[in-house]
């Protein structure tokens, strides 16, 4: 049963920069102990392999090398930030750097995660850099890694991308999503349909399905028709907006604390 299929305006994703994608360009294997190995299909954007619009799997050269080695990327504890501490720095060229300050304060005040200014003692760190898109790798990659931010990306988008850097995937890509949502691929440009593939998680899905997660796509993500591409199969809780970028939900906090106990 579909709960909501109303016509609504398409969210202006150009402002956030989270939905800059392209045609499918290839695939890479990723896996976990809990769910085995799965193939992720990605788009080639700015010489990067981009998954689901804003997740950086690596450079195209890195992906090509991985494919030649027939390797599988195993996600899990190795990609966690030790002691839940994430050193960061901000590129001086980043427009509106206060949004990073606000996003850091949001994570630090609501979770046990601590984003701290980078010092010379920090070999692994995140650097916030200007870009035409907003995107991040998932989890700690080692050395310097970037969170790219579009010029108009709001604080909520910064919080979202920081969630990826911590190790959180998109909520609507959970293993159990079919019980809660239906995806209308007929309303999505065929070149962008790969963005709705389900990922391989690095553990069991945490808690109940969270429509209000800051890690959830908005209902009209990648829509070409003005109608929802993500439809609820169960009632969305009162006051909850699918795809909101206002604040971490209780479910987001729980997920962060589960992978950083």
Residue ranges and their predicted role:
Residues 1-261:
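Zinc-dependent metalloendopeptidases
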